[in-house]
Amino acid sequence: MEIRIKFFFSCFVDAVGQPSTEYEALKRKLHSGILEFWWFVSSEVKKIRKEAENFSPLLDVSGLNHADGYATWRQNEFEELSSLIQRRLDYLQNPSDCSKAKKLVCNLNKGCGFGCQLHHVIYCFIMAYGLERTLILKSKGWRYGVSGWESVFFPLSRTCTSANGSSHGPWRANGNVQVMNLPIIDSLTPRSKFLPGAVPNDIAGRLTRIHGNPTVWWIGQFLKYMLKYQPATKQMLDDFGRKVNFQNPIVGVHIRRTDKVGTEAAFHSVEEYMSHVEEYFQQLLVSQPVPQKRIYLATDDPKVFTEIRQKYPEYEVLARTDFLVCTFSSQVCRIAYEIMNALVPDAADHFKSLDDVYYFGGQEPHYHVAVLPHTAKTPQEMNLKVGDILTIAGNHWDGYSKGSNLRSQVYASLFPSFKVSVNALILFHFAYKFLRSNRN
């Protein structure tokens, strides 16, 4: 295997010791294609899971990240890009003269839960970044801390938290007003080119080279800036980590029940979640010892704790996890995935969702590109030609996804997931006048 890997990546080595964009894209496509094909095969032929070699294709391609010699470069590039965005956000949020700064006002108290409200602030922050406005977060009376955001997290600015200004106006009423009020994403009219799904063009080249889902990396950077704990909050979390002996490797399992089931999401048994946890640890055992299998369980149903302890006694039940098993229909699940991708290089595939593909509520459509042709085998499937642009409604996690073909105008039909590429980037042009990247 080592010889095959060396032959593979030696074809893409450049003169300065960095992998080419083509190499990184091909490596990532190889991994995602094998993963999607594996889901197809395992769904059609369940007994194949009993074979001792069942994980070897995934293990072989995962090994490229270590065997190709670029791990240090990826880590450094990840840290450099993240540092660039964090410095830009810090500059934007801390103007030298708050009384003259252009501002975007966001009301935290959207009528929804914690995860939804965090995504609302991310949306506001992304819009502020695109418009070059300082984000002013109104949070007094917040349901999760009546004193406001600052009772749990640090303020988003050290120098500018007042919404005062010489002129005020609603979204797009007058782009020149000093203080603009932003509606929730559901009511945003006209729509904006900055909405999630898009990433800035000045970092797109570097970002597509190091990450399999640039959109989630981009969103994760705003969470990284936002979620800076007050000392009391950090102390509480540190104490909890010591109390439960939080150690890696660990899989995060988020099981949402109660009000979600039957309305926004279907019921999924504990066994469905834990089968993917067990699969992860089986793969890990091939390459390293695992003295104790641990999961970090988050759920709104107390009975789940008892059920997992009874059915899986070999697990220690404890989002700095190495892998996530959850449902992307849940905002909290998506928040955990976004945070994970802000902390480690390219964690795009470190998850298993039991329902939806990753999305940001209110975002622009998911666009994918067909890289292999397909002839429909059943009335539920669609034909594909190489280059077809598709919008994705969801991944069935059995090797098939559902979507619409913009060329043939076939809607809500199935196609093999491994025959399409990851979502194409939507770029917005934004030339920062400050803290520009020194390379693309």
Range-by-range predicted roles:
Residues 1-278, 283, 288-292:
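Secretory-pathway glycan-assembly enzymes, especially type II membrane glycosyltransferases
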Residues 99-101, 115, 246-248, 290, ...:
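Eukaryote-biased feature marking scaffold/signaling PDZ-domain proteins and nuclear chromatin regulators
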Residues 291-351, 358-359:
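Donor-binding and catalytic core of enzymes assembling or modifying cell-surface/extracellular glycoconjugates
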Residues 429-440:
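Long, low-complexity intrinsically disordered regions
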